[in-house]
Amino acid sequence: MAAARPSLGRVLPGSSVLFLCDMQEKFRHNIAYFPQIVSVAARMLKVARLLEVPVMLTEQYPQGLGPTVPELGTEGLRPLAKTCFSMVPALQQELDSRPQLRSVLLCGIEAQACILNTTLDLLDRGLQVHVVVDACSSRSQVDRLVALARMRQSGAFLSTSEGLILQLVGDAVHPQFKEIQKLIKEPAPDSGLLGLFQGQNSLLH
């Protein structure tokens, strides 16, 4: 089978990895739509486990910002602590060990900080980045909107969780489809995205 052209942004389980960025206790009451984005990220994690997509988890200065929130469901994953506003330096060794890697699916916070800088670092490495828009947020909706627009300008793909999940599973005859169907039976919770995409002045037009 011919390889997908990079410009199409196709995602396949065998050449993808899921990044979970800094969804920690101290952010719980400050990030817009925090419960909703964690819920969607948890859904992405469950799908990644079903499809054997590798998962990488970071925590920003956990001594001060606390551990990853339990509802993300990261049991069995070893979080990597960092202070840099990018996941890439902490995950450099993991990335280098995966020559088949083409696509990174990115969830977490904050959009204008660690998500943006992680995206730029990954693009610099020649990887495709799929920002899971319903699993990324910021304290400020303005920062969130501008960061999404900035990442798109730089060459990242903006995708919804369900769109990526269905790309990964690929076919209703997939042996894991029935389990995945249970996860997406209910639409992803509203995380304020519709208002960001509406209006004549939207930066995402």
Swiss-Prot record:
Keywords: Cytoplasm, Nucleus, Phosphoprotein. It comes from the Eukaryota. SUPFAM superfamilies: Isochorismatase-like hydrolases (SSF52499). Signal peptide: none annotated. The modification Phosphoserine is found at S7, S202. It is found in: Cytoplasm; Nucleus. GO terms for cellular component: cytoplasm; mitochondrion; nucleus. The keyword Phosphoprotein applies. GO terms for biological process: protein destabilization. Pfam families: Isochorismatase (PF00857). PANTHER family: HYDROLASE (PTHR14119), ISOCHORISMATASE DOMAIN-CONTAINING PROTEIN 2 (PTHR14119:SF3). Belongs to the isochorismatase family. Interacts with CDKN2A. This is Isochorismatase domain-containing protein 2. It comes from Homo sapiens (Human).
